């Protein structure tokens, strides 16, 4: 499956669709059917990447600055930010390489192709590690709620560091294999199963945490004989928070893995071909997730926000 010139080179070998038409509208696929195609300009990719890059650099710098944030939970959050940083950074570099290939450095296509292969490995490994750290954060929060008294003995900093190292090593290893054997159906299926496993893990853990929180709120309400007001107020906040958290995860990552699934199930079907045409949009959603992650997992912390102000004012 060759990489088309107008497609993102980020894992672009997965996209076997014809060259995209640069506008939002109805485009004809190989069978003449009409389908909606959303073109994402290079400038938009570059802008999204730069915003995410700056945002996640601030998260990493903030956690590194404050020793009070050197805990297992913030270790996972920092690594999530680092993964998103690499996704964004590789996107920025990839966009610049696309522009350079069309410009003065077109004669050095071989050098750019080698650099692009390295970027593909970095991008793929950072995407896998980002999913892993989202799962690790969910597990950490689950343990902190259901094993609160033993949390500090279960989730220690050395164990968190070993988990982080294992995630990075596994991500680099599997991403290298993925890039090398991208045309094997088993590889694509493994990626899809991995995404579904992370989705199920997060859904089960967060739903269980929500149920425990509801039970706790009801217990407090009965204790103070104010069951209805407390239950009503919490009943709105809890499900809404859970819906936003899981909804954003599925919205940003789901289309990309749907793309991989359809490559296996119906690579030649006209309807699937219409979905393939929006490959660039699916990648843009992943970059958007890298922008949203710090807002959900990092900036909700008052301590982190206070330290962020010090970082922005250069109070080191």
Swiss-Prot record:
Assembly mode: Interacts with MGRN1, but does not undergo MGRN1-mediated ubiquitination; this interaction competes with GNAS-binding and thus inhibits agonist-induced cAMP production. Interacts with OPN3; the interaction results in a decrease in MC1R-mediated cAMP signaling and ultimately a decrease in melanin production in melanocytes.
GO cellular component, as recorded: cytoplasm; plasma membrane
Functional note: Receptor for MSH (alpha, beta and gamma) and ACTH. The activity of this receptor is mediated by G proteins which activate adenylate cyclase. Mediates melanogenesis, the production of eumelanin (black/brown) and phaeomelanin (red/yellow), via regulation of cAMP signaling in melanocytes.
Protein family per UniProt: Belongs to the G-protein coupled receptor 1 family.
Gene name of the record: MC1R
Annotated compartments: Cell membrane
Effect of residue 93 to L: In Isolate Urko
PANTHER family (UniProt xref): G-PROTEIN COUPLED RECEPTOR
Chief location: membrane
Glycosylated position list: 29
Annotated lipid attachment (S-palmitoyl cysteine): 314
Membrane topology of this protein: Multi-pass membrane protein
Molecular function in Gene Ontology: melanocyte-stimulating hormone receptor activity
Protein name: Melanocyte-stimulating hormone receptor
Record topology, Cytoplasmic segments: 64-72, 140-162, 211-239, 300-316
Gene3D superfamilies reported for this sequence: Rhodopsin 7-helix transmembrane proteins (1.20.1070.10)
GO BP terms, alphabetized: adenylate cyclase-activating G protein-coupled receptor signaling pathway; regulation of metabolic process
Family annotation (InterPro entries): GPCR_Rhodpsn, GPCR_Rhodpsn_7TM, Melcrt_ACTH_rcpt, MSH_rcpt
Presence of keyword Glycoprotein: yes
Keyword presence, rRNA-binding: no
Extracellular domain ranges by topology: 1-37, 94-117, 183-190, 266-278
Residue stretches spanning the membrane: 38-63, 73-93, 118-139, 163-182, 191-210, 240-265, 279-299
């Amino acid at each position: 499956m060759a990489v088309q010139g107008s497609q993102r080179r980020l894992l672009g070998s997965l996209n076997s669709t014809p060259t995209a038409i640069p506008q939002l509208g109805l485009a004809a696929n190989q069978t003449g059917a009409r389908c909606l195609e959303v073109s994402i300009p290079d400038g938009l990719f570059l802008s999204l990447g730069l915003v995410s890059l700056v945002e996640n650099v601030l998260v990493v710098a903030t956690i590194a600055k404050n020793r009070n944030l050197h805990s297992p939970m913030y270790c996972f959050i920092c690594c999530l930010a680092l993964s998103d940083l690499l996704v964004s950074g590789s996107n920025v570099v990839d966009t610049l390489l696309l522009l350079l290939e069309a410009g003065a450095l077109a004669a050095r296509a071989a050098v750019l192709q080698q650099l692009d292969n390295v970027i593909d490995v970095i991008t793929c490994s950072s995407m896998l590690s980002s999913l892993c750290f989202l799962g690790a954060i969910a597990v950490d929060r689950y343990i902190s709620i259901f094993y609160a008294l033993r949390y500090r003995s279960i989730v220690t900093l050395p164990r968190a560091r070993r988990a982080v190292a294992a995630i990075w090593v596994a991500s680099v290893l599997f991403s290298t294999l993925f890039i090398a054997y991208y045309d094997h159906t088993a590889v694509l299926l493994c990626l899809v199963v991995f995404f579904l496993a992370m989705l199920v893990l997060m859904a089960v853990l967060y739903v269980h945490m929500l149920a425990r929180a509801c039970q706790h709120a009801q217990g407090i309400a009965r204790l103070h004989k104010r069951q209805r007001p407390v239950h009503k107020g919490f009943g709105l906040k809890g499900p809404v928070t859970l819906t936003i958290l899981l909804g954003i995860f599925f919205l940003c990552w789901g289309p990309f893995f749907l793309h991989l699934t359809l490559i296996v199930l119906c690579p030649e079907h006209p309807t699937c071909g219409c979905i393939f045409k929006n490959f660039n949009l699916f990648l843009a959603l992943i970059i958007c997730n890298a922008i949203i992650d710090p807002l959900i997992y990092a900036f909700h912390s008052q301590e982190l926000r206070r330290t962020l102000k010090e970082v922005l004012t250069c109070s080191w």
